Amino acid sequence: MSRAALGEQVERFGDVVYAITADERGKGHVVSVTAVWRGDELAVPAGRRTSHNVETTGAMTLLWPAPAGEPYSLIVDGDAHVDGDSGEVALHPTRAVLHRVARADPDLPSCVTVLDA
């Protein structure tokens, strides 16, 4: 699929996401934030730990939980950087999938690619 398809999915899932980062030792950090498009990147507000992790690894994942009754969550991986002017972290999406949730119909595909850059 394409960046346009990703844009459609992000609009459908809304602006509340979980930002997932890891430090240099691989210790995970998860925070609930809002995401907005800034050009071709998704921007989220960032605290100290999220900023540190992104500065260290250059990576972040955003997770939109499945809405009630829906079979898929949206997961977007990408290259990330801290915007020094805004203090936000910007994610340049490199891969996005719809991932089937645990209680969804098992006959549905477990993973649907939205973006594979």
Per-range role (PLM):
Residues 1-117:
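Binding-site signature for planar aromatic cofactors or substrates
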